[in-house]
Amino acid sequence: MKRRWQEKRKAAGKSIHEPGPNIVMGANAQVALEKFARYFDVETRLVPISEERKYCLDPKKAMEYVDENTIGVYVILGSTYTGHYEPVKEMAAHLDEYEARTGHSVPIHVDGASGGFVAPFATPKLEWDFRIPRVVSINTSGHKFGLSYVGVGWVVWRSKEFLPKDLIFELHYLGSVEYSFSLNFSRPAHPIIAQYFNFIHLGFEGYRQVALADLKNARLLSRALENSGLFTVLSDIHRPAKGLLSSAKQTVGFDEENVENYVPGLPVVSFRFSDEFRQKNPDVEQRWVQTLLRAKGWIVPNYELAPDMQDVQILRVVVRESTSAVMIDRLVSDILEVTEGLAKADSPMHALNNLQSRSTVEGHHGKLDEGSGSKSSGTYAKQC
């Protein structure tokens, strides 16, 4: 996108340095998106998130950050924080109107790192891909819901015109003509072989069954947490889609197994203490749940939402193909046990409060000294 923007600017006799290119994304963007902007000298324009817009990119607000130097807009198919899909079609509509009004065409890149292997199989009717003309490129990670090893990722362009030829290298010394478009050089083949095996072995229907099972278990976890009264669930995959009533009891013929009846999203469950629990237990810190669950063998991170909502902390569970209904039952039991234990004044779990002032070698291991990293630019990327 940057190279195509440069070519257009040069053709129009305009500078490519002043004021320089920018890219627009929600403040909830994954760190890889911010890395691109920093490494390739592109100004990052972060759109504030809000509860009303499901902690994701607000297309209408995003247009306040778009101008003739915007090389593109990142739209995320599966927010790292809550698993929500950002509205690709809505964003495209705003950019269509902008082009009609100004003559400036701003493309969309869909970051489908996780959703790229969920949405096409679980909700194929959802329009987020090349069915939308303004989407020019899509990426996804094979090592997430693609079920491959770490190290394989994919990027697909709408057509050859969106990948400038001068970015492609032609190699002749490997016994045949090879074409390369990559930032790394020698790399292992096993992740790609594993990905290819899954493509052949599972096929469309296999990936669909995996995605549907993941979402079903994620809905099970979401409902269990909400019904406990101890937590508020921020993710929405267990809620009926717009236009459907909120309860199967209120809806004649509601099919609880049909994924199309629910808000689309990743099989991710993000939750926090309910307001009622906080009022009754003001001294209990949510981050203690993470620590206690780790002692039981669960890795459930607790972290702040993106800027503008950084006062809200959430716990997050990613449901994958290895997660069964039995595991969900055990996880729920452990979450409720540690949470209820923290609420009891005579519980040993309150000893956590006394541990906060202690520092351990384990707690410091692998961390940089405070201030060693660059200043946070707004996304959730923070110093290790």
Show where each model-derived region lies:
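Generic preference for well-ordered alpha-helical elements
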Residues: Q30, Y85-V88, I192, A218, ...
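Generic structural hydrophobic/aromatic packing signal, biased to beta-strands
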Residues: I23, T44, I108, I138-T140, ...
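Catalytic cores of large soluble enzymes that bind and process phosphate-bearing ligands
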Residues: M25-A29, K54-L57, S79, G83, ...
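Non-catalytic terminal extensions of PLP-dependent enzymes
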Residues: R9-A12, A92, L202-C384
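Generic alpha-helix detector with strongest preference for long hydrophobic helices that associate
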Residues: E18, E43, G72, V136, ...
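Noncatalytic linker/hinge segments flanking ATPase motor cores
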Residues: V66, S114-F121, Y149-W154, V177-N184, ...
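Conserved PLP-enzyme active-site core in the AAT-like
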Residues: M1-F169, Y173-V177, F181, H190
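Active-site C-terminal subdomain of aminotransferase-like
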Residues: P120-P267, F271-R278
